[in-house]
């Protein structure tokens, strides 16, 4: 079988979801939430319903929570079933098997071989990310896949390297983590039905919210660590900023979108939008500080963001 396709999509004509439009503060959030936004969108489902998890992100010492949509909520909202794939044989063989059965595969991948990362990682540096395999054409050595903010294709050498085609067996090579995404029992619910399911999900995640203000704690850690972070240079800074500021800002933007989608928590949504835009200002301000070696004074900005976090949480709590 030359071609195995679980979801036929024309990459050239694909239009990403509005959450990935250029008008967003954070066009790309993190690799896992991004693929789910686009997979659900491609399945003609509304990803705004599954974003309640973002209310619970916390500052965890050296990073903010790398937030992901809970698999149980994907099942309850949409009838999409996610399970770990036991990668006991080459990934290409699994892809042929499962895509032919109409099952998508999410898998870790090396961004060095992903052409959609042109200008950043592609053919420049080896970076772990997550993609979703959708359309495999073995005869043409071509793959259609979801990654970051859209749907793309790769082929030829990128295909060979992604799937290790022709590589000798290497007992030291550990298989990449992968999951199957089954949607044969997809549930196409109305907006009202999704709202009824999503409300208790937000309440459950709210119960897991940080016990103290995570933006305040992050500001304290930033001030303590900044001399070392600044001295480590831009490469270190970019990795640190992705793990911290970007996750905070992207989660806040998605939470604001979810709350606006609900239609009854606009005050809270505005507060989290303030955190999102503040995070973008901070990430740029901090980059300039690293580049110029000048001091970073972010106390006022972080104070505004911390106050916005408290306002937002208070508003959600009052409505619950």
Regions of interest found by a model, annotated:
Residues 2-89:
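A structured, charge-rich N-terminal accessory region that forms the first stable segment of a protein
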Residues 123-131:
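Short coil-to-beta-strand transition motifs
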Residues 78-119:
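Long, hydrophobic/aromatic-enriched structural stretches that serve as scaffold segments
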Residues 24-40, 65-69, 191-192, 204-222, ...:
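Active-site nucleophilic cysteine motif
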Residues 137-244:
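Noncatalytic regulatory segments and standalone regulatory/sensor domains
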Residues 44-48, 154-166, 226-230, 261-269, ...:
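Hydrophobic/basic alpha-helical segments enriched in Actinobacteria
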Residues 246, 252-320:
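Charged, long alpha-helical assembly modules
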């Amino acid at each position: 079988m030359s071609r195995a396709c679980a979801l036929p999509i024309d990459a050239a004509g694909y239009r990403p979801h509005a959450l990935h439009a250029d008008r967003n503060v954070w066009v790309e959030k993190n690799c896992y939430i991004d693929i789910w936004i686009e997979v659900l969108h491609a399945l003609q489902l509304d990803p705004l319903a599954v974003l309640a998890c973002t209310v619970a992100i916390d500052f965890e010492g050296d990073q903010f929570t790398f937030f992901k949509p809970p698999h149980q909520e994907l099942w309850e909202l949409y009838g999409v079933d996610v399970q770990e794939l036991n990668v006991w044989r080459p990934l290409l063989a699994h892809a042929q098997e499962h895509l032919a059965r109409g099952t998508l595969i999410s898998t870790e991948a090396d961004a060095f071989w992903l052409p959609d990362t042109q200008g950043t990682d592609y053919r420049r540096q080896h970076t772990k990310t997550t993609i979703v395999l959708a359309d495999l054409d073995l005869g043409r050595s071509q793959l259609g896949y979801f990654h970051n903010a859209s749907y793309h294709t790769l082929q030829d050498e990128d295909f060979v390297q992604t799937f290790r085609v022709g590589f000798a067996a290497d007992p030291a090579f550990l298989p990449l983590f992968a999951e199957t995404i089954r949607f044969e029992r997809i549930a196409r619910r109305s907006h009202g039905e999704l709202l009824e399911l999503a409300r208790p999900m937000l309440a459950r995640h709210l119960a897991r919210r940080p016990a103290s203000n995570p933006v305040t704690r992050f500001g304290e850690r930033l001030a303590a660590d900044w001399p070392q972070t600044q001295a480590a240079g831009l490469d270190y800074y970019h990795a640190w900023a992705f793990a911290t500021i970007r996750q905070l800002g992207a989660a806040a933007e998605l939470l604001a979108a979810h709350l606006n989608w609900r239609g009854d928590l606009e005050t809270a949504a505005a507060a989290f939008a303030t955190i999102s835009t503040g995070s973008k200002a901070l990430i740029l301000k901090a980059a300039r500080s690293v580049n110029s070696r000048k001091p970073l004074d972010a106390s006022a900005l972080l104070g505004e963001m911390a106050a916005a976090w408290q306002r937002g949480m208070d508003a959600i709590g009052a409505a619950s």
